[in-house]
Curated annotation (Swiss-Prot):
The gene is gatd1. Component of the FERRY complex (Five-subunit Endosomal Rab5 and RNA/ribosome intermediary). The FERRY complex directly interacts with mRNAs and RAB5A, and functions as a RAB5A effector involved in the localization and the distribution of specific mRNAs most likely by mediating their endosomal transport. The complex recruits mRNAs and ribosomes to early endosomes through direct mRNA-interaction. The keyword Secreted applies. This is Glutamine amidotransferase-like class 1 domain-containing protein 1. GO terms for cellular component: cytoplasm; early endosome; extracellular region. Residues 1-20 form the signal peptide. Belongs to the peptidase C56 family. It comes from Danio rerio (Zebrafish). Keywords: Endosome, Secreted, Signal. InterPro entries: Class_I_gatase-like (IPR029062), Prot/Nucl_acid_deglycase (IPR050325). One of its GO terms (molecular function) is glyoxalase III activity. Transmembrane segments: none annotated.
Length: 213
């Protein structure tokens, strides 16, 4: 029996948190397929947002498991992982989007063409990855939250980053569907999902990509 590949789930430690629904779907789909490791900046615990009746019990049960304690993103060696997954994280634009540690890991994944998957507001985390003042995902096609989706938030005027604008301004190719529609883009080894609703489709593509390697 072959050993399972290892997947790193990177989550935000910012106060805006991590989508409970997206993280639950990521974890439940990946757990049978991968050995999982979670990581956050500073190894801080994950602050779940949008917890409701369907996710509340799962979050409670998850929080007492050993793997609920994230590793420090700063100490992660990207070479140890075969896949990288960033769920929908409203907090990503506050910390992951500027993380030198995540940039280092993403540079390794690009150099080795290893699968990377980012969903919804987690796509903002990809903005951290620059080399020689150039974004390493320029010339990639991708999606992420559209302005039409983001503008519905009361925090829109205070957002430090608009993913759609960043991608277009830094040489990427951006597409989106209508608000809240399932929309996933696969370009080479990069998978992006537009929103929380796209989580399952994006992660299933990550699993397929890993199975084909």
């Amino acid at each position: 029996m072959t050993s399972k590949p290892t997947c790193l789930i990177v989550a935000s430690a910012a106060s805006a948190g991590v989508s409970a629904r997206s993280f639950q779907q990521c974890f439940n789909l990946c757990n049978p397929v991968f050995n999982l490791q979670t990581a956050t900046p500073g190894g801080k615990s994950i602050d779940f947002t949008g917890v409701d009746d369907s996710t509340g019990r799962w979050v409670q049960e998850f929080s007492i498991k050993p793997y609920a304690n994230p590793a420090k993103l700063e100490s992660i060696d990207g070479a140890r992982y075969q896949a990288l997954l960033i769920p929908d994280c409203p907090g990503a634009m506050n910390d992951l989007a500027h993380s030198g540690s995540l940039a280092r890991i993403l540079s390794h994944f690009i150099s080795q063409q290893k699968p990377v998957c980012a969903v919804g507001q987690g796509v903002a985390a990809l903005c951290c990855a620059t080399e020689d003042q150039k974004w390493i995902f320029s010339r990639y096609s991708m999606t992420g939250p559209s302005v039409f989706e983001l503008v519905r938030s009361s925090e829109f005027a205070n957002l430090p980053l608009i993913v759609e604008d960043f991608i277009k301004d830094n040489g990427g190719s951006y597409t989106a569907s209508i608000e809240d529609a399932v929309h996933v883009v696969l370009d080479r080894h990069l998978i992006t999902g537009q929103n929380i609703q796209s989580t399952t489709a994006a992660v299933n593509n990550l699993i397929l990509l890993c199975n084909n390697r």
